Amino acid sequence: MAKKVKKVVPQGIAHIHSTYQNTIVSFSDLKGNVFAWSSSGAIGYKGTKKKTPYAAGLAAAAALEKAKEFGLKEVSILVKGVGPGKATARKQIEASGLTIKEVKDVTPTPHNGTRPPKKILKRM
């Protein structure tokens, strides 16, 4: 049986997807292949605790530990979503000692697309 060789990824992309209910942090190579990920739910939080910024920070730290095993040194951060944990997750990655190439907000915004649900219309 052949010995499994661990992939080395010196440069990567950190994707932070923050929703009102959860925060998902994943690390991919430059082609987009995910090699490490974590989320607020995956680290053990359930229900309303998943959406807290503290849980998002722990999810980012857990994903960072997995990503550092692959030799990650330089990262671009892509933030998507409107949840409360996106800033905390970003700060956790910035404080980790990795070289940050760029921080970009890639939240999709409609150019007057479909009609939003009733609860969002009430807020407007």
UniProtKB/Swiss-Prot annotation:
An example Gene Ontology CC term for this record: ribosome
GO biological process annotation, one example: translation
Domain of life: Bacteria
ATP-binding listed as a keyword: no
Pfam family, one: Ribosomal_S11
tRNA processing found in the keyword field: no
Free-text function comment from the UniProt entry: Located on the platform of the 30S subunit, it bridges several disparate RNA helices of the 16S rRNA. Forms part of the Shine-Dalgarno cleft in the 70S ribosome.
Region (Disordered): 102-124
Protein name (record): Small ribosomal subunit protein uS11
Gene3D superfamilies, per database record: Ribosomal protein S11
Organism, scientific name: Metamycoplasma arthritidis (strain 158L3-1)
